[in-house]
């Protein structure tokens, strides 16, 4: 029975994250995920959280060079 629990846990973790689809919505907007402490310039290039991980946000790729970290 323990083997079944371990097998289920392994399968669950294996399919939990799909690396090919990470941040798909942000990338479709032409953005990239950055920590929330980064300020995107101009402000219109800040798309918000979208599908980025916790405490990260989506900024337009062109604003990467202009990003300011607090």
Swiss-Prot record:
Subunit architecture: Monomer.
GO BP annotations, alphabetical order: envenomation resulting in occlusion of the pore of voltage-gated potassium channel in another organism
Q: Where are the transmembrane segments?
A: none
What is the similarity comment for this entry? Answer: Belongs to the crotamine-myotoxin family.
Q: In which tissues is it expressed?
A: Expressed by the venom gland.
Job of this protein: Cationic peptide that possesses multiple functions. It acts as a cell-penetrating peptide (CPP), and as a potent voltage-gated potassium channel (Kv) inhibitor. It exhibits antimicrobial activities, hind limb paralysis, and severe muscle necrosis by a non-enzymatic mechanism.
Q: Which organism is it from?
A: Crotalus helleri (Southern pacific rattlesnake)
Protein name (database record)? Myotoxin
Q: Which keywords does the record carry?
A: Antimicrobial, Disulfide bond, Ion channel impairing toxin, Myotoxin, Neurotoxin, Potassium channel impairing toxin, Secreted, Signal, Toxin, Voltage-gated potassium channel impairing toxin
What taxonomic lineage is listed for the species of origin? Eukaryota, Metazoa, Chordata, Craniata, Vertebrata
SS bond partners: 26-58, 33-52, 40-59
The record's GO molecular-function terms, alphabetically, read:
potassium channel regulator activity; toxin activity
Per the record, a Pfam family? Myotoxins
Which compartment or compartments is the protein found in? Secreted
Q: Which PROSITE patterns match?
A: MYOTOXINS_1 (PS00459), MYOTOXINS_2 (PS51345)
Gene Ontology cellular component? extracellular region
Q: Which residues form the signal peptide?
A: 1-22
Q: Which InterPro entries did the record assign? A: Myo_ane_neurotoxin_sf, Myotoxin
Q: What's the chief localization of this chain?
A: secreted
